[in-house]
Design a protein with these regions (language model features):
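N-terminal capping segment at the start of a domain
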Residues: 2-28, 130, 318, 378-379
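A non-catalytic alpha/beta surface segment that caps or lines the substrate-entry region
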Residues: 22-69, 73-75, 79, 89-90
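Active-site metal-coordination/substrate-binding segment of hydrolases
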Residues: 67-161, 189, 391
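Midchain, well-structured core segments that form catalytic/ion-binding scaffolds
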Residues: 102, 117, 126-139, 172-302, ...
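Short glycine/serine- and small hydrophobic-enriched flexible loop segments
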Residues: 149-156, 240-247, 398-401
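Short helix-loop-beta-strand segments that form the rim/entrance of peptidase-like active sites
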Residues: 153-175, 256
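Active-site-adjacent substrate-binding region
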Residues: 236-253, 260-264, 309, 319-368
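Zn-dependent metallopeptidase/amidohydrolase metal-coordination segment
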Residues: 269-271, 345-403
């Protein structure tokens, strides 16, 4: 099975995670994919492949040499983002891309265009795997899963020496729970890489510091005909509070190392309203300052309308793994060398998000992030060059061989 064939099979399994669920995994359908991965691993000779009670898949590629070297791991996640539909994915492979518009859905007039996504120009001459414009593709992160499994197949069928390699596939990464029940001790790796990045060549060991904020607004309803000087409209107060935050510090206006406040959801009526935000920044001090801005905005609303009008709940989600990777920069240097060995130019970029590896790094498993080749994650215009998946499969195998030298 080629990596592309494997990927197309994996995306046929709907695995959208659900933040409202309290189970692990959050959706039962992730277990169906987990069982499929165990079957594939067993078929290639990974004898200890199994799925645990929480839906995590583990397995081992045994060492084929006697040299004493650290145990390395490769990790990807099985779920797809709830931000876009993830069922009935109709993936197809295009002809080698010519640089123009790609018709995703002729009936609905949906196009994938370099005018909107100029990075498409980097894939001229390559076959692209695309959607029909009505669902996401699931390259985040089933491309990573497929690439790891196909690399494992290469390692198992080659006589080139490598050490013990641990594989893991996690549920619920997209809703921030991928590392919640990860068995770091049982996994048994000294170091690992997640394969959950974007375009070919991306190599990441810096991620956002992340927090979530929920603000509950308590209003005061009274008949609008006699409300003068008495009504407190919670929906309007919510809008007022949002206006106290920096208008140009949202995802739309920011890139690279610039952090943001992102209003994820809002609902409101006269008596009650609720705002939900995520707060992000690479710099820890700026991250703490952003949370303080949120606290100050709520305090100002309380000053205007009375104590208890704005009730803020802040929760840290994960932190920048840079401080945990810095003592292990050989992981980055070896990844760069492996990329160059397969003709890929490494591009170190900050992750404008998080990975399972970010949290695992703080649990004693240093875990930078490697590219999958995918683009436009979490949406209907997601795509991945098939040729890049093949390159990344070879890159992963080369990295494991290299680490045994």
């Amino acid at each position: 099975m080629t990596v592309v064939e494997r990927f197309l099979k994996l995306v046929s399994y709907p695995t959208t995670s659900d933040e409202a669920s309290e189970t692990c995994p959050s959706t039962a359908r992730q277990l169906a994919l987990a069982q499929e991965l165990v079957r594939q691993m067993q078929d290639m000779g990974i004898a200890d492949a199994h799925v645990d009670q929480d839906g995590y898949v583990y397995g081992t590629v045994p060492a084929n040499c006697d040299k004493k070297i650290p145990v390395y791991g490769l990790i990807a996640h099985m779920d797809t983002s709830p931000d876009a539909p993830g069922e009935n994915i109709r993936a197809r492979i295009t002809e080698p891309y010519d640089g123009g518009d790609i018709v995703l859905n002729e009936e609905k007039h949906i196009m994938l265009s370099p005018k909107e996504y100029p990075q498409l120009k980097n894939s001229v001459g390559k076959r692209l795997i695309v959607t029909d414009g009505t669902t996401l593709l699931g390259a985040d992160d089933k491309a990573g899963v497929a690439e790891i499994l196909s690399a494992a197949q290469l390692l198992l069928t080659s006589e080139k020496p490598h050490g013990t390699i641990k594989l893991a596939f996690t549920p619920d990464e997209e809703i921030g729970r991928g590392a919640d029940r990860f068995d770091v001790k049982g996994f048994g790796a000294d170091y690992a890489y997640t394969v959950d990045g974007g375009a070919l060549g991306e190599l990441e060991y810096e991620n956002f510091n992340a927090a979530s904020a929920k603000i509950e607004i308590c209003g005061k309803s009274i008949h609008p005909g006699s409300a003068k000087g008495q009504m407190v409209n919670a929906a309007l107060v919510a809008m007022e509070l949002h206006g106290l935050l920096p208008a140009l510090e949202t995802p739309y206006y920011t890139e690279k190392y610039k952090g943001f406040y992102h209003l994820v959801a809002m609902r409101g009526e006269t008596e009650q309203a609720e705002l939900q935000y995520i707060i992000r920044d690479h710099d820890r001090a700026k991250f703490e300052a952003r949370k303080a801005v949120m606290e100050k905005a709520c305090a100002e609303i309380d000053r205007r309308y009375g104590a208890g009008t704005a009730v803020l709940t802040l929760r840290d989600s994960y932190y920048n793994m840079k401080e945990k990777i810095a003592p292990c920069m050989f992981l980055i240097e070896n990844a760069k060398k492996a990329m160059e060995s397969v003709g890929v130019t490494p591009k170190i970029v900050p992750i404008r998000g998080g990975t399972d590896g970010a949290r695992l790094s703080f649990e004693g498993l240093p875990c930078p992030n490697l590219c999958t080749g995918g683009e436009n994650f979490h949406g209907r215009f997601e795509y991945i060059p098939a040729d890049d998946m093949e390159t990344i499969t070879n890159l992963l195998a080369q990295l494991m061989w290299q680490l045994a030298e």
